[in-house]
Design a protein with these regions (language model features):
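Catalytic machinery of carbohydrate-active enzymes
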Residues: 1-262
Length: 262
């Protein structure tokens, strides 16, 4: 829990409508906010804030789009509060250890097999090739990061893998997941929320970017190394790159072994 967050207002779908404009404005007005920070270039939110009677409105330039999200946020925040801010995130978890036992003779690796869309997934067979090779050379335990909707992907991976030393996150809540991730040696996987959580917990991450903005989603932290499609750069790899077939399992295996050795 974060004591600096007093309340979260859920921007549910109904608030996107015309009536939702006035509903959200009414909600904000009741809070008697004296200032608002809007981390996008939305004219709608600007007008809602004004309609709610908020006097001091800090916002990105209107209609800002296709920006490097962490850079824009950093510049905006520094200009708004007059202080230098660090883009390196940090999740502070309680000191209670996980109920699981982390054998130091093993390498504990978080696997991000899924992603928010099919084109962002490197593919189960590729991960099987990597984990089979790595587990032949080192004693490894793999933690399968995913929710209940990812069960089919996780089951496919387990059925095809040589190693059977797995633990799935599908039945855990976020606090339980964090208590495990923070003791991991490495995250390997697609561009997922689990990658960003791992990074914020100080875990080294190998992120496979095949169809999402590699620099925008990895450049904010020292903990994520982006693997990008052959022929692309970290800046050119973005939405619609469709680079699944341009990242070889051999290249990823080499990178994972480098991390394990170091």
């Amino acid at each position: 829990e974060d004591n600096s967050v007093n309340e979260i207002i859920d921007l549910e779908k109904s608030l996107d409508t015309i009536s939702g404009f006035f509903k959200l404005s009414k909600i904000l007005k009741k809070k008697n906010f004296d200032r608002v920070y809007i981390f996008n270039g939305s004219l709608r939110y600007n007008l809602i804030a004004k309609h709610a009677g908020i006097k001091s409105i800090f916002q990105y330039p209107l209609f800002t789009s296709k920006d490097i999200i962490f850079q824009t946020a950093k510049i905006f925040t520094e200009n708004s509060i007059g202080e230098i801010v660090d883009t390196q995130p940090s999740i502070k978890s309680d000191k209670k250890k996980s109920d699981m036992i982390f054998d130091k003779n093993y390498k504990h690796i978080i696997l991000g097999l899924s992603a928010s869309g099919e084109t962002k997934r490197w593919g189960v067979n590729n991960f099987v090739k990597v984990t089979n090779k790595v587990s032949r050379e080192y004693k490894c335990k793999f933690y399968l990061a995913g929710g209940s909707s990812d069960q089919k992907i996780i089951d496919e991976f387990i059925s095809k893998s040589e190693s059977k030393n797995f633990f799935s996150f599908t039945n855990l809540n976020i606090k339980e997941i964090i208590s495990i991730i923070k003791y991991a040696d490495l995250y390997l996987g697609n561009d997922t929320g689990f990658m960003h959580i791992s990074s914020a917990l100080g875990v080294r991450c190998i992120g496979i970017f095949i169809d999402s903005p590699a620099y925008a989603y990895s450049g904010y932290t020292k903990n994520i190394e982006a693997i990008i499609p052959r022929g692309e750069t970290i800046n050119s790899t973005t939405h619609n790159t469709n680079g699944r077939d341009k990242i070889s399992s051999d290249d990823v295996i080499k990178k994972v072994l480098e991390y394990i050795i170091s």
